[in-house]
């Protein structure tokens, strides 16, 4: 077996499959593009679903890739096991309706065992297979695998919901008896026992059925196009080929671990307690790549995952004695390890470091807040006479504040309290079950549509015309091909068309189809790409249509021009965002409609009003500069040399279209555009908002809609000016400010008057002092305007030694407000109010020294006051 670096393993994998006629699919962005079912790209096949479900036919049915992936459903296991990671690299080879079982197994065995390639010893390889899949068993035998090395496993059948499914065969490497201390042997495989002896290095999925949850597996229909989907973990292959005990001792992780050794002054012991080293090395890889791909830490979705990973890594750094910000210092090491295939981490190093460091600094402040919350919980336990911190509270510390359970346990036990481990596990399991359920719901592929996949007739989109005559090539009605149609809805393919199919954020054209007499025979309501790329027109049929007949196709020109204004403005906006807030503000989604444009981009905070003003100004400057718009067709490399901005995650063919707006913007784009930027007329941002962690959205309008937006603002300003009696529009802001200042002064004066009135009334209230259970207390109903006045009473009470406890009740409108304040450790205000509030049909809580409650039954106020003594 060859001893190769991880980079050599990756390259040899790709080279082997290229020698078998495969095209190399570049690694996609970790943030899925146009796939809301996935939080992250989590496998090599995740970006190829469109090929497997038949919605798109690839140029080459043989594909290979090395795909960076993230899975975070079991974060807690990272660092505890030898092979669990959040970010990993999946090597794959795929066949879309081309070769199948025989070639997949034979070529796979060749790659693993040939001296020209990996050169694994054959006697160290074991394979599992689905018991009913005798063909795979026989093919392995034909390759020279001993029957004793083939293990039937009932679970070797891959399916996730509806869509492609089939048996799979897994390949394992036997590391020998040293990793099998109990000498269990092949039962480890047969009974799926967790072990370190047999390491799964490759899984070959034989996708041959359309899974249908409504029928038994034996009744699944064969796929019209059988597929091969395989995945081999680079980290596992590296561990085996480099003789490493775990994945972490490979060249993918050890350079990071060595840097952590320098930062901590501690030494990594492969046989000792090394969990913190592993967690940090794993998590900084995931953070570096995810942030580089446009995801940012936040409180939900992907952002929440990244924030949790970072905080977990920081806490493990503290366990190693690293108390200052340090994770950001590891980003260059991650980039250097992966540079040969993934240069993006080093290219975006400064930005990634900035985000990681900023998040570390934020977490340092959060730790202080979490410590304060834990202190409050422990104080409450003491007041209530309890000795155990509940699992739900531990989980809240963990989930909300990022506190590891070990830290909570350590601090609580130091204070003399026990930990409710079972309650915590229960809360954790509930969250994990929710996460796994979400993954299962979104994981399936669509079923293949044989009718659409069977369209092979050529069709060409013509960019520079709004109307043309063309022959009707294909009619599909009720999911069947037909030669003619006279009513209902149908799908049509023409030899050529002026109708743009929805793509790249630009909506489809609409329009009409006319016969040779000039009569409208169909209305085009939508256009989408067929699996083989042809524009597929969805039409409402008004009169007879037949294959082979020529028709005149006319798009709605006015609508197209409105869409083009927004699409061209989107390119200007993208460039302006780069100039004003930074090059990290890359496109995360867009929509170019007739009435507006919507542009999503990566950014870590709200865009300020001043920045929006600059962006809007810059876009309009380019409109007024009347920049010429040109389009060029070339290859991707030439386009990049031209400075074209490629959207990360988009797949480009051999020939790409470059749209250049003067010297201001150059992008790869297949959409339609204006001839000159001046045709946009006017650009106006109407909204900026956050739509998820690290993703912002701008909605803008152009042309007529922009003019109307400005006019609406002017009308609103005129109305405000009239209301505040401003002599001119320019004076309205000053008049509003003057009124606001006057109102603030009056409110301040009102508060002062209320405080004086409360102080005067307090003299009478504080005279009525009672005593019970050795505690002096005041219990009184007061007449106040709001709950804030009750707090003013309490503040005055605290200034002097009137009593130990104060209970005030006020009927304000239809509600009852209750306040309890305590100066003695013998009475916990928060606990006391829980006993009093139900009397007035209310509830509340608070701290040991102050608590408040709200109720709805004012008729029971006297009863509440009478109950104060017994609730002390």
Curated annotation (Swiss-Prot):
A Gene Ontology cellular-component term:
cytosol
Required co-factors: Zn(2+)
Single annotated GO MF: alanine-tRNA ligase activity
Q: How is the cofactor bound?
A: Binds 1 zinc ion per subunit.
> Which keywords annotate this record?
Aminoacyl-tRNA synthetase, ATP-binding, Cytoplasm, Ligase, Metal-binding, Nucleotide-binding, Protein biosynthesis, RNA-binding, tRNA-binding, Zinc
SMART domains (UniProt xref): tRNA_SAD (SM00863)
The UniProt entry, under Gene3D superfamilies, shows: 2.40.30.130, 3.10.310.40, 3.30.54.20, 6.10.250.550, Bira Bifunctional Protein, Domain 2, Threonyl-trna Synthetase, Chain A, domain 2
Where does the chain bind Zn(2+)?
567, 571, 669, 673
Q: Which SUPFAM superfamilies match?
A: Class II aaRS and biotin synthetases, Putative anticodon-binding domain of alanyl-tRNA synthetase (AlaRS), ThrRS/AlaRS common domain, Translation proteins
Q: Which domain of life is it from?
A: Bacteria
- Name the catalysed reactions: tRNA(Ala) + L-alanine + ATP = L-alanyl-tRNA(Ala) + AMP + diphosphate
Record-level GO BP terms: alanyl-tRNA aminoacylation
Pfam families from the entry? Answer: DHHA1, tRNA-synt_2c, tRNA_SAD
Which ranges form a coiled coil? Answer: none
The EC designation for this entry is 6.1.1.7
| Family matches, as InterPro entries | aa-tRNA-synth_II/BPL/LPL, Ala-tRNA-lgiase_IIc, Ala-tRNA-ligase_IIc_anticod-bd, Ala-tRNA-synth_IIc_core, Ala-tRNA-synth_IIc_N, Ala-tRNA_ligase, Ala_tRNA_ligase_euk/bac, DHHA1_dom
Q: What is known about what this protein does? A: Catalyzes the attachment of alanine to tRNA(Ala) in a two-step reaction: alanine is first activated by ATP to form Ala-AMP and then transferred to the acceptor end of tRNA(Ala). Also edits incorrectly charged Ser-tRNA(Ala) and Gly-tRNA(Ala) via its editing domain.
Q: What is known of its domains?
A: Consists of three domains; the N-terminal catalytic domain, the editing domain and the C-terminal C-Ala domain. The editing domain removes incorrectly charged amino acids, while the C-Ala domain, along with tRNA(Ala), serves as a bridge to cooperatively bring together the editing and aminoacylation centers thus stimulating deacylation of misacylated tRNAs.
Q: Which family does it belong to?
A: Belongs to the class-II aminoacyl-tRNA synthetase family.
Query: What is the name listed in the Swiss-Prot or TrEMBL entry for this protein?
Result: Alanine--tRNA ligase
Organism of origin:
Streptococcus agalactiae serotype III (strain NEM316)
* Gene field: alaS
């Amino acid at each position: 077996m060859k001893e190769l670096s991880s980079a050599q393993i990756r390259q040899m994998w790709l080279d082997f499959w290229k020698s078998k006629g495969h095209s190399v699919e570049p690694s996609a962005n970790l943030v899925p593009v146009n796939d809301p079912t996935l939080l992250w790209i989590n496998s090599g096949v995740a970006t190829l679903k469109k090929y497997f479900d038949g919605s798109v036919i690839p140029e080459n049915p043989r594909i290979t890739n090395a795909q960076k992936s993230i899975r975070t459903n079991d974060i807690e296991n990272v660092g505890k096991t030898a092979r669990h990671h959040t970010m990993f690299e999946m090597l794959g080879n795929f066949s879309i309706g081309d070769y199948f079982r025989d070639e997949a197994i034979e070529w796979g065995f060749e790659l693993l065992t040939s001296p020209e390639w990996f050169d694994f010893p054959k006697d160290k390889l074991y394979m599992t297979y689905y018991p009913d899949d005798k063909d795979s068993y026989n093919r392995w035998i034909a390759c020279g695998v001993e029957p004793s090395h083939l293990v039937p496993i009932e679970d070797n059948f891959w399916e996730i919901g509806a869509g492609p499914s089939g048996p799979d065969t897994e390949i394992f490497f036997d590391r020998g008896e040293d990793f099998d201390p109990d000498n269990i042997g092949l039962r480890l495989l047969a009974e799926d026992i967790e072990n370190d002896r047999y390491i799964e290095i490759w899984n070959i999925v034989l996708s041959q059925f359309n899974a249908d949850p409504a029928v038994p597996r034996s009744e699944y229909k064969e796929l019209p196009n059988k597929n091969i989907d395989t995945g081999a973990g680079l980290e596992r292959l590296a561990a085996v080929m480099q003789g490493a005990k775990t994945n972490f001792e490979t060249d993918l992780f050890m350079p990071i671990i060595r840097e952590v050794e320098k930062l901590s002054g501690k030494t990594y012991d492969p046989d000792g307690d090394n969990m913190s080293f592993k967690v940090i090395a794993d998590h900084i890889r995931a953070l570096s790549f995810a942030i580089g791909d446009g995801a940012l830490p936040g409180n939900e979705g992907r952002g929440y995952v990244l924030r949790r990973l970072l905080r977990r890594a920081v806490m493990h750094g503290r366990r190693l004695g690293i108390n200052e910000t340090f994770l950001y210092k590891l980003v260059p090491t991650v980039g250097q390890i992966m540079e040969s295939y993934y240069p993006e981490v080093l290219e975006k190093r400064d930005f990634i470091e900035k985000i990681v460091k900023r998040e570390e600094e934020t977490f340092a402040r959060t730790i202080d807040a979490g410590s304060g919350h834990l202190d409050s919980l422990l104080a409450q336990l003491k007041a209530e006479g309890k000795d155990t911190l509940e699992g739900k509270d531990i989980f809240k510390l963990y989930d909300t504040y990022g506190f590891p359970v070990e830290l909570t346990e350590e601090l609580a036990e130091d204070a003399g309290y026990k930990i409710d481990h079972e309650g915590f596990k229960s809360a954790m399991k509930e969250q994990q079950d929710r996460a796994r359920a979400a993954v299962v719901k979104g994981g399936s592929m669509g079923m293949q549509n044989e009718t659409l996949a069977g369209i092979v007739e050529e069709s060409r989109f013509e960019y520079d015309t709004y109307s043309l005559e063309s022959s009707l090539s294909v009619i599909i009605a009720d999911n069947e091909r037909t030669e003619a149609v006279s009513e209902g809805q149908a799908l049509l393919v023409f030899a050529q068309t002026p109708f743009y199919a929805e793509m790249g954020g630009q909506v489809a054209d609409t329009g009409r189809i006319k016969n040779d007499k000039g009569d409208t025979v169909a209305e085009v309501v939508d256009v989408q790409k067929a699996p083989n790329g042809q524009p597929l027109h969805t039409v409402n049929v008004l009169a007879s249509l037949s294959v082979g007949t020529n028709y005149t196709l006319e798009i709605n020109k006015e609508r197209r021009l409105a869409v083009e204004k927004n699409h061209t403005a989107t390119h200007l906006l993208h460039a302006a965002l780069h100039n004003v807030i930074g090059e990290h503000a890359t496109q995360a989604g867009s929509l170019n409609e007739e009435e507006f444009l919507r542009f999503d981009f990566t950014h870590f905070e709200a865009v300020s009003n001043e920045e929006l003003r600059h962006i809007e100004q810059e876009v309009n400057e380019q409109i007024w500069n009347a920049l010429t718009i040109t389009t060029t067709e070339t290859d991707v490399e030439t386009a990049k040399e031209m400075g074209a901005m490629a959207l990360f995650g988009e797949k480009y063919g051999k020939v790409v279209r470059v749209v250049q707006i003067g010297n201001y913007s150059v992008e790869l784009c297949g959409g339609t555009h204006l001839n000159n930027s001046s045709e946009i007329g006017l650009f106006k941002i109407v909204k900026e908002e956050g739509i998820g962690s690290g993703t912002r959205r701008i909605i803008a309008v152009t042309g007529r809609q922009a003019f109307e937006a400005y006019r609406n603002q002017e009308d609103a300003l005129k109305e405000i000016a009239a209301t505040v009696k401003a002599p001119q529009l320019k004076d309205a802001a000053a008049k509003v400010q003057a009124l606001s200042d006057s109102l603030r002064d009056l409110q301040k004066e009102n508060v002062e008057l209320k405080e004086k009135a409360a102080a005067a009334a307090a003299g009478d209230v504080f005279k009525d002092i009672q005593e019970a259970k050795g505690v002096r207390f005041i219990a009184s109903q007061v007449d106040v305007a709001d709950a804030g006045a009750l707090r003013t009473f309490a503040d005055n009470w605290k200034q002097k030694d009137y009593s130990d406890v104060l209970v005030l009740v006020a009927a304000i409108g239809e509600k009852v407000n209750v306040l309890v304040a305590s100066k003695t450790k013998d009475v916990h205000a928060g606990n006391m109010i829980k006993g009093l509030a139900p009397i007035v049909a209310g509830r509340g809580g608070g701290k040991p020294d102050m608590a408040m409650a709200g109720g709805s039954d004012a008729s029971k106020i006297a009863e509440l006051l009478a109950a104060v003594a017994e609730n002390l």
